[in-house]
Curated annotation (Swiss-Prot):
E.C. designation(s): 5.1.1.15
Subunit and interaction comment: Monomer.
Gene Ontology MF: a single term: 2-aminohexano-6-lactam racemase activity
UniProt-recorded name of the protein: 2-aminohexano-6-lactam racemase
SUPFAM superfamilies listed in its UniProt record: PLP-dependent transferases (SSF53383)
Residues the record lists as N6-(pyridoxal phosphate)lysine modifications: K267
Cofactor needs: pyridoxal 5'-phosphate
Top EC category: isomerase
Catalysed conversion reaction: L-2-aminohexano-6-lactam = D-2-aminohexano-6-lactam
Amino acid sequence: MTKALYDRDGAAIGNLQKLRFFPLAISGGRGARLIEENGRELIDLSGAWGAASLGYGHPAIVAAVSAAAANPAGATILSASNAPAVTLAERLLASFPGEGTHKIWFGHSGSDANEAAYRAIVKATGRSGVIAFAGAYHGCTVGSMAFSGHSVQADAAKADGLILLPYPDPYRPYRNDPTGDAILTLLTEKLAAVPAGSIGAAFIEPIQSDGGLIVPPDGFLRKFADICRAHGILVVCDEVKVGLARSGRLHCFEHEGFVPDILVLGKGLGGGLPLSAVIAPAEILDCASAFAMQTLHGNPISAAAGLAVLETIDRDDLPAMAERKGRLLRDGLSELAKRHPLIGDIRGRGLACGMELVCDRQSREPARAETAKLIYRAYQLGLVVYYVGMNGNVLEFTPPLTITETDIHKALDLLDRAFSELSAVSNEEIAQFAGW
């Protein structure tokens, strides 16, 4: 008898790159559904952490990748230009409303894109200091971990001159100030305490994803950017997970009425293939040659997939679709909250939604163990959803933008049942899955 796929995975692939919550073993997928090796279908409310922006087996991506693979324009942009990468760069530049001349840097992931943005800023400006937020997960390379503030990376070496601020969380407000102004006051105080001209970059997520799917108070990002720019600090918007139509707008920063100096994209840009991008002023990305490169950067097959994603977003008006379906999902989650007291807060924009679980709605004590059991039971019932947050108690919903309303309703029914059957999962069953 053939050994089960998950067992083979355990024997052959190292744990360094695993973030597992239950024994999911995938043999295929279609639309917003994953297929296990026994043929069981599961509704995917994670979308591979947002990477499967168009779902699985989308015809536009299949056609684009097949054509690019059949007649590949090389394999990289390092030492030769290739049409898919150049065309994708032009398309991305046309989508960005920033003033002045901008260029593109291509990478494989949000991790290398955020690191490249930071390194380029330091090289171009001579300023190595950086502002970021507690709870922020900007990547898993040495460079991107240096200015990440997530608790899982607490032991990583941090950048010299790092200023780490609380992220504005209306559900758990810093100094009991839901407006976030107390954080801006803290920022002003910290900037006054460091040498002028020492801070080069400020990284912020317009929705903090891995920190708990937190939507900041209206106007916070604009006020934050104004303070930074008054000190000559470039504002970098990390939209790796929440950008490109997911929030209900093409770019998530559009909700906030400001335009960042630099935009970082990834995950959904490749529609499931490794692809990321930095959009930045030309003087930043032209500051040096051969300074931030890897051999397969600008790969034409990945770039072709990226073009297919952007064309589908435009043709099918996926921002409007994400807004409508996200509202449907959050309305359904709100109905669940009426029946399940574990649910403390529901938040999000478009198809980037979060549901925070608490032991008690008054004390808001994080329900970490219950969260792990809930998603495990949901998996057993046929639903894929993961948790995020500094306390591991926020369910994150980032399904394919193409998910059907039928699948949303079905997923809500399964989640409702999982809440009711939480006791069916033992501590022993979840103990082997570290999660976050």
